[in-house]
């Protein structure tokens, strides 16, 4: 953001007086962020140049508790083109901003509503980043969220593995520990091996991200971030599922956290780019048809 935006936004954020939601996904457009119904056209009001926004957003997590929404809208160009999308910081109390249906999910309840924009006006100063280059702002956001998700999923996966090992050593059906059975050992060996390899890749990628500018990350590390993300999110689902199996009935119950871990982390295989999108990103770098 600009120096003026930093002065306006950062202090109240640090004081807990301001929060932002992320408005990229639309009801008719999920993974393909370059197609969107939301548009913004130039309009001057009371001598102040700005933009009039119309459209819709979905999965705007955090509403109604946040004060602003990072709203991505097409300002020029054709659908399917990355160029021509702009990010606007829109106050949630702006006339024409309407919170609609709240979406219940597998794990997280009701703070994911639809939003409708009807002639919502914002000044030019509400543009975050460069005009027509809003997807670069979105990329910065999702790269950081993807590596965060990967670390979170790895930690939860390791917990599930550790608890399954502990229980398998303690539980003694038919007079001997579950742990002596290779049907228990081998799946946990594979899960632990994957966890160890992922840990190194996540640490390496996160350290490299810290040493680069955000544009450099997008250019040089995007594929590594995607590798971390989709593999870790798959791992935690597999680890939680097997931990349930090792624990039997009590593992499936809410007296153990495995079902909650599964429900919570299963969404990570869809949010911040579905795992198929992550794999497509890796393939693009691998085969040289995507930067």
What are these regions (language model features)?
Residues 16-24:
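A short, Trp-centered hydrophobic/proline-enriched beta-strand micro-motif
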Residues 35, 93-123:
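Flexible, small-/acidic-enriched active-site or ligand-binding loops
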Residues 38-42:
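A structural signal for short hydrophobic beta-strand segments in well-ordered beta-sheet cores
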Residues 119-137:
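Long, acidic (Asp/Glu-rich), low-complexity accessory segments flanking structured domains
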């Amino acid at each position: 953001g600009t120096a003026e935006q930093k002065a306006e936004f950062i202090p109240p954020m640090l004081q807990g007086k301001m929060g932002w939601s992320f408005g990229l996904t639309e009801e008719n457009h999920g993974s393909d962020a370059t197609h969107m119904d939301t548009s913004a056209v130039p309009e001057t009001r009371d001598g102040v140049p700005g933009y009039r926004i119309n459209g819709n957003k979905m999965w705007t997590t955090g509403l109604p508790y946040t004060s602003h929404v990072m709203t991505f809208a097409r300002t020029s160009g054709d659908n399917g083109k990355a160029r021509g999308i702009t990010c606007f910081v829109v106050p949630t109390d702006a006339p024409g901003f309407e919170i609609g249906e709240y979406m219940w999910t597998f794990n997280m309840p009701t703070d994911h509503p639809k939003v409708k924009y009807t002639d919502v006006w914002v000044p030019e100063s509400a543009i975050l980043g460069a005009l027509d280059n809003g997807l670069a702002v979105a990329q910065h956001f999702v790269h950081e969220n993807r590596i965060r998700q990967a670390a979170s999923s790895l930690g939860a996966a390791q917990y599930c593995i550790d608890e399954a090992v502990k229980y398998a050593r303690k539980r003694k059906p038919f007079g001997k520990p579950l742990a002596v059975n290779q049907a228990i050992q081998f799946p946990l060996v594979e899960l632990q091996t994957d966890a160890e390899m992922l840990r190194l890749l996540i640490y390496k990628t996160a350290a490299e991200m810290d040493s680069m500018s955000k544009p450099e990350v997008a250019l040089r590390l995007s594929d590594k971030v995607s590798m971390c993300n989709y593999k870790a999110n798959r791992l935690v689902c597999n680890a939680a599922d097997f931990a349930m199996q090792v624990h039997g009935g009590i593992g499936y119950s809410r007296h153990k956290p495995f079902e909650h871990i599964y429900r919570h982390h299963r969404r990570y295989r869809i949010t911040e780019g579905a795992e198929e999108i992550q794999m497509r990103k890796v393939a693009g770098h691998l085969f040289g048809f995507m930067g």
